[in-house]
Amino acid sequence: MKVLLCDLLLLSLFSSVFSSCQRDCLTCQEKLHPALDSFDLEVCILECEEKVFPSPLWTPCTKVMARSSWQLSPAAPEHVAAALYQPRASEMQHLRRMPRVRSLFQEQEEPEPGMEEAGEMEQKQLQKRFGGFTGARKSARKLANQKRFSEFMRQYLVLSMQSSQRRRTLHQNGNV
């Protein structure tokens, strides 16, 4: 929720005016992101706008800006969106620890065009199945017509009925 709120705040900043401070901070984030895990875009923009240059966050940015003239162009909004929604390294490791979130993260990371059906199959496997215990006296037709009766239980019922019929025939023939 906190990240969503921060993103909303940043988007409101970008929608009003795309100033040079915002462009400089985005450039700095793109250049220094692997080196600085604690880089905060909001703090960088505030420090730039207030001209608080000797701060520990803005000093490496000024060095990067002086070293290279690479900047984001205002005509490339996909770079701005990518910079806004790029999670930090600490957030990435936290997400990779959780197995369910890890699978969602991998799907977002590498979307393949032909894998939509596999995603639907995986979702069906994770759905909770509602089916009750079946009594021994219920008929096979009643159970076969129920919507929530699982395929596994149908197979079990058929196998149990076949084995009980075999036992009866063996018992009647005197082989048991």
Swiss-Prot record:
Keywords: Cleavage on pair of basic residues, Disulfide bond, Neuropeptide, Neurotransmitter, Opioid peptide, Secreted, Signal. GO terms for biological process: chemical synaptic transmission; female pregnancy; neuron-neuron synaptic transmission; neuropeptide signaling pathway; sensory perception; sensory perception of pain; signal transduction. It is found in: Secreted. Residues 20-95, 169-176 form a propeptide. The keyword Disulfide bond applies. One of its GO terms (molecular function) is neuropeptide hormone activity. Its main location: secreted. GO terms for cellular component: axon terminus; dendrite; extracellular region; neuronal cell body; plasma membrane; synaptic membrane. Residues 1-19 form the signal peptide. Specific enzymatic cleavages at paired basic residues probably yield other active peptides besides nociceptin. The N-terminal domain contains 6 conserved cysteines thought to be involved in disulfide bonding and/or processing. PROSITE patterns: OPIOIDS_PRECURSOR (PS01252). Predominantly expressed in the brain and spinal cord. Also expressed and secreted by peripheral blood neutrophils following degranulation. Belongs to the opioid neuropeptide precursor family. This is Prepronociceptin. It comes from Homo sapiens (Human). The lineage of its organism: Eukaryota, Metazoa, Chordata, Craniata, Vertebrata.
